Amino acid sequence: MLNIKKKDKVLILSGKDRGKKGEVIYVSPDKGKVIVTKINVVKRHTNPTRKDLGGIHKKEAPIAISKIMLICPKCSRGSRAKFDKLSDGKKIRVCRRCGEVIV
């Protein structure tokens, strides 16, 4: 089970954007990749079509889940998340640094 979900704040651990923070837009659990806002931006050269003009367009490329770390909303630092079970059987994510529940 992945500990990264859509709309989580994450810290980039390696690569050209190391140290930057962003929000997760898309998670692909089968490929082990995520897309983060304004991180790993690449240029795509497109030909003109009937619908849109050609040119150079910038877009976010996927980044491996192993290269990012979840940011705890309480302590505002990069931390790993662990899963705890509640008495009713639901799984929740908990920050390993401060013990706060991550929604």
Swiss-Prot record:
UniProt feature coiled coil, ranges: none
GO cellular component: ribonucleoprotein complex; ribosome
Keywords attached to this entry: Ribonucleoprotein, Ribosomal protein, RNA-binding, rRNA-binding
GO biological process: translation
Molecular function as annotated in GO: rRNA binding; structural constituent of ribosome
InterPro entries with a match to the protein in the record: KOW, Rib_uL2_dom2, Ribosomal_uL24, Ribosomal_uL24_KOW, Translation_prot_SH3-like_sf
Intrachain S-S bonds: none
Pfam families for the chain: KOW, ribosomal_L24
RNA-binding listed as a keyword: yes
HAMAP family: Ribosomal_uL24_B
Subunit structure: Part of the 50S ribosomal subunit.
Described purpose of this protein according to its UniProt entry: One of two assembly initiator proteins, it binds directly to the 5'-end of the 23S rRNA, where it nucleates assembly of the 50S subunit. One of the proteins that surrounds the polypeptide exit tunnel on the outside of the subunit.
Similarity-based family: Belongs to the universal ribosomal protein uL24 family.
Protein's name according to its UniProt entry: Large ribosomal subunit protein uL24
Upper taxonomic lineage: Bacteria, Pseudomonadati, Elusimicrobiota, Endomicrobiia, Endomicrobiales
